[in-house]
Regions:
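A structural signal for beta-strand and strand-to-loop patches characteristic of beta-rich domains
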Residues: 1-276
């Protein structure tokens, strides 16, 4: 059998319902009339939301509710082997770019299911700030997961540099005035806690300390560079345009068995400065 899932190629506004068009056929051309389609719907954040602007991160990384399951799908195709699946809006209060993902299987009695996946982009505003860290990656060991991963790292004795754009979903760089940029230090006071059920566990108390704030202007067809001195510790860079926030990925820094914080770039991006 063949299964086709179609959605709108253009990002949809955050207040819209989303429709997927489904078509199933047998390999000899006959429609898969009455066959069952089963699957799942997922909501995921789209940090790299603009393909035309590689390296720029969009969306509030601290925003809750952007990564969750929206339930199961169980429908039957009509006599023409077609169906239309409309997903009612459950994300209109979110401010980050999103992907609505449909993963579905077309079932056949006595045969193997055919599984396909479709992704619909959701864009929460006409334009959003985007942030690109201007420093390289380093392989970092995370003792909690006992694994290494590449993460952006601010070198010792260097500034944390970022490019900021104001762009729409097509990657057009627009002009923006009075974008508010804040550098927040994420203080973590670690301590050990013991319980009979969990034994000894490493925990921390969190406190955010604002270290810098400035207002910037971003030109049309361009970007604005911002630089901040950072000491040992964990940070995030926040960019606010009206009520919309933009965030980059989460960054951490570990070295020789101890955690070395970095700066968390974009609206909530962590980076850790290299103290070695």
């Amino acid at each position: 059998m063949a299964l086709t899932l179609k959605n709108d190629e253009q990002p949809q506004p955050a207040d819209a319902d989303i429709t997927f068009n489904v078509e199933g056929r047998y390999l000899y051309g006959a429609p898969a009339a009455g066959n069952a389609l089963q699957g799942q719907l997922y909501l995921r954040p789209a940090r790299d939301a603009v393909a035309a602007l590689p390296g720029y991160q969009f969306g509030d990384i601290t925003e809750e509710g952007v990564k969750r399951s929206l339930g199961d799908v169980d429908i039957k195709l009509d006599a023409n082997g077609k169906a239309q699946l409309t997903v009612e809006n459950q994300w209109d209060q979110l401010h980050s770019p999103l992907n609505l993902i449909l993963q579905a299987s077309l079932l056949e009695t006595g045969g193997r299911p055919v599984t396909r996946r479709a992704t619909q982009a959701i864009w929460p505003a006409e334009a959003l700030p985007g942030i690109r860290p201007l420093f390289g990656n380093k392989s970092i060991y995370d003792y909690r997961s006992d694994s290494y991963r590449d993460e952006p790292t601010v070198p010792e004795n260097s500034l944390a540099d970022f490019d900021i754009v104001y762009a729409n979903s097509q990657g057009e760089k627009l002009a923006a005035e009075k974008l508010n940029v804040r550098l927040i230090r994420e203080r973590r006071d670690y301590y050990w806690s013991f319980s009979d059920s969990e034994g000894w566990q490493s925990r921390y108390d969190a406190k955010d300390l604002q270290e810098d704030e400035r207002s910037i202007t971003v030109p049309a067809e361009g970007s604005t560079k911002v630089s901040f001195p950072v000491e040992w510790g964990s940070y995030r860079l926040e960019v606010q345009a009206g009520e919309k926030l933009s965030a980059a990925c989460v960054f951490r820094r570990a070295m020789t068995g101890r955690i070395i914080p970095m700066v968390r770039a974009a609206l909530c991006a962590r980076i850790r400065s290299n103290s070695a």
